[in-house]
């Protein structure tokens, strides 16, 4: 049975919701799944003034956690077309794991959220995936077997590189059922891939 970590950072709760959907998909494929978040690095007064969602149920991950999983699915929102600094700061601490090759051959995947349709979803996914490739991980995206990402009847997230959602500039849009279905599908694919590689 594959052991999967869904590792995320969420400012306003959109990625927390997506992370839980990713985990549902991985569990449905038979994996053992943990959902953990990275530490908030913004000062408390800044986070509170900006109404960050600070009461998230997931425990905070440590770098030492990462090597104990067969697959790691990383989610972070965009910041100007790239990975949010909180996740970047966390992954930047993984040099020791990289040096030892501790993540080589493990399965990796990415998911994200942006405020708008053209707010950097794919570039943010690539910035996450770049880290995972440097760690030596095998990448699983979100193929068009998730047909919801091809919808033209409504605004939807999703890309071949990973599950996505849109939050709107004021955070008012929550992940749609199509967005969540994409997240579940990606979680399922990661779990199935890890099971093939690790049993």
Swiss-Prot record:
<keyword id="KW-0521">NADP</keyword>
<dbReference type="InterPro" id="IPR008254">
    <property type="entry name" value="Flavodoxin/NO_synth"/>
</dbReference>
<dbReference type="InterPro" id="IPR037513">
    <property type="entry name" value="NQO"/>
</dbReference>
<protein>
    <recommendedName>
        <fullName>NAD(P)H dehydrogenase (quinone)</fullName>
        <ecNumber>1.6.5.2</ecNumber>
    </recommendedName>
</protein>
<feature type="binding site">
    <location>
        <position position="98"/>
    </location>
    <ligand>
        <name>substrate</name>
    </ligand>
</feature>
<keyword id="KW-0560">Oxidoreductase</keyword>
<feature type="domain" description="Flavodoxin-like">
    <location>
        <begin position="4"/>
        <end position="190"/>
    </location>
</feature>
<dbReference type="InterPro" id="IPR029039">
    <property type="entry name" value="Flavoprotein-like_sf"/>
</dbReference>
<dbReference type="GO" id="GO:0008753">
    <property type="term" value="F:NADPH dehydrogenase (quinone) activity"/>
</dbReference>
<dbReference type="GO" id="GO:0051287">
    <property type="term" value="F:NAD binding"/>
</dbReference>
<comment type="similarity">
    <text>Belongs to the WrbA family.</text>
</comment>
<keyword id="KW-0288">FMN</keyword>
<keyword id="KW-0285">Flavoprotein</keyword>
<dbReference type="GO" id="GO:0050661">
    <property type="term" value="F:NADP binding"/>
</dbReference>
<dbReference type="InterPro" id="IPR005025">
    <property type="entry name" value="FMN_Rdtase-like_dom"/>
</dbReference>
<keyword id="KW-0520">NAD</keyword>
<dbReference type="GO" id="GO:0010181">
    <property type="term" value="F:FMN binding"/>
</dbReference>
<feature type="binding site">
    <location>
        <begin position="78"/>
        <end position="80"/>
    </location>
    <ligand>
        <name>FMN</name>
    </ligand>
</feature>
<feature type="binding site">
    <location>
        <position position="134"/>
    </location>
    <ligand>
        <name>FMN</name>
    </ligand>
</feature>
<feature type="binding site">
    <location>
        <position position="12"/>
    </location>
    <ligand>
        <name>NAD(+)</name>
    </ligand>
</feature>
<keyword id="KW-0547">Nucleotide-binding</keyword>
<dbReference type="InterPro" id="IPR010089">
    <property type="entry name" value="Flavoprotein_WrbA-like"/>
</dbReference>
<feature type="binding site">
    <location>
        <begin position="113"/>
        <end position="119"/>
    </location>
    <ligand>
        <name>FMN</name>
    </ligand>
</feature>
<dbReference type="GO" id="GO:0050136">
    <property type="term" value="F:NADH:ubiquinone reductase (non-electrogenic) activity"/>
</dbReference>
<feature type="binding site">
    <location>
        <begin position="10"/>
        <end position="15"/>
    </location>
    <ligand>
        <name>FMN</name>
    </ligand>
</feature>
<dbReference type="GO" id="GO:0050660">
    <property type="term" value="F:flavin adenine dinucleotide binding"/>
</dbReference>
<dbReference type="GO" id="GO:0016020">
    <property type="term" value="C:membrane"/>
</dbReference>
<dbReference type="Pfam" id="PF03358">
    <property type="entry name" value="FMN_red"/>
</dbReference>
